[in-house]
Amino acid sequence: MVVMFWNKMFPFQFKNKAQSIVKKDTFSLWFKVAVACVPSAIMGILFDDYLDAYLQTPIVISIMLIFYGLLFILIENWNKKRTPTTMALSDISYKTAILIGAFQVLSLIPGTSRSGATIIGALLIGVSRVAAAEFTFFLAVPTMLGASAFKLLKFGFEFT
């Protein structure tokens, strides 16, 4: 996916060796993505031990998978009747980004899809399906890198 979206993700465009163009929209998007990562980073660091100790159970995971599956069906049916207020990725504001980031916090609960939670959140606040999916993809890159780095640091690079 990163290879496929590289031109859209990379904020620089090289015309030749001497001249490069900075894509301001891409820089702006990455700043919004960084803002959207803040809520889940804070909550993940604060509650990681609790989530692992008390919610990492088959029953919680099963309940959450069923709950979000049903919720996704309900939101999709409800959303068919609405016209999105944010149509394009470039139209996503910092406020919308932080709200989508708040929905990403739900993915800390085992059994919750990170992309599902952020897409549902984006649809609820009026983002189009396409923009919601694209923003969720961009949001995955720093989120997964950060979560992986956190776990590696926490466990001292010990692999089992």
Give the label of every model feature segment:
Residues M1-T160:
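Multi-pass membrane proteins that catalyze or facilitate reactions on polyprenyl-/lipid-phosphate substrates
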